[in-house]
Amino acid sequence: VWLTVLALLFIAALIVVLWLKISPFYLLIPVGVWGAALLYRFILSMNRSAAADAWETEKSNIRKKWTDWAQRSIVLVDSHTILPEPLSLPDVITQASGGRNADLFLFPRDEDEDLWRSGYPYVAEHFYQKLSELAEYRQPVTLHIDAPDEEAYLNWQQRFEEIAEMAGVRATIKPLSDGESLMGDWVENRQFEGIHVIFSAWLNEDASDAEFTENATWLVFASPYAAKQNKLPVKAVLQRPIAISLSDETAQNKAFGHYADYALKNRTVHAAWFTAPPKDTQQYVGKLRQAGVSWNDNFDLPLIHTPEPYTGQLPRESHWLTLGLMAENSDQQNQLFGWQKDGNLYMGCLIHQNSVAYADYLITVRKVV
């Protein structure tokens, strides 16, 4: 095209020179105009290319920033979950065939009393050793107690104050009012101090009129900084949970897409635990599939975990139990969790230490520290 333009300009200049009988040096004018235009186009092209490269670099930096934000994690140092006999944690986790039941199971009561208060010595006894182990880490301990009401909290507080003294552990004990916000604060402040324990126990008020299967869960968290500096054991990492609004379908689909793009980038999901009705669970999994999430369909292990058919009816607040079961489920590496609260789906990912994502986490810790 440019050569054609040059030829046309040269022919036009030649006609003018012959017609007006002027100096043949005027034939160089088209060449100069053509060269200037070509140079201008070259400079413009280079500027556009540089701008495009700069924009691609900026987009890449933005994506990396959001990916780093979405994949920021805290450390799960330890966990312990107990269920009443004859329930078996492995059977509940793997959803073993033949393990389904509709019965309710309770912890033993002290002195054959039915009230729930007579059951807490049995439960607390199971966590005495876990509380004792915290003394080995030589870190400030904060125990956050999840209880259905103030009376239950005060009973647990008294019991744990006693066993903390016996175990030689200096612990600050407080009620857990908003665990979702608390974990969000821990993730945001990756250098928060000390060890934080979430303890959740649900016992029926009257064993003779039980409403759910009883359970108790112990989750020990620390910051990546504290875990590295104090050489704490790392059982898994908990990736930043997010809240997805359930009231706006368009915003919900967009949020699932962003979660797939950033939080689950380059990751395969091995299991999903949603404390939600089955219809809602299938909907969430479907939206994640549509968003491009990669699923590991290993038929030897369940992809969608629903503990309730194997434990019997669970209490309304069973999400800490879900995290406890996930922590024990080390055979599946990247595990999604989600529960409904206040019109939102609170969703995150627990990553066990034998996964590639865990290696990525260690690299991140080295950079941070």
State where each predicted segment sits:
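Conserved "HGTGT" condensation-loop signature of ketosynthase/thiolase-family condensing enzymes
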Residues: V1-F192, W202, D206-T213, T217-V369
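Active-site-adjacent substructure of cysteine-protease-like catalytic cores
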Residues: I198
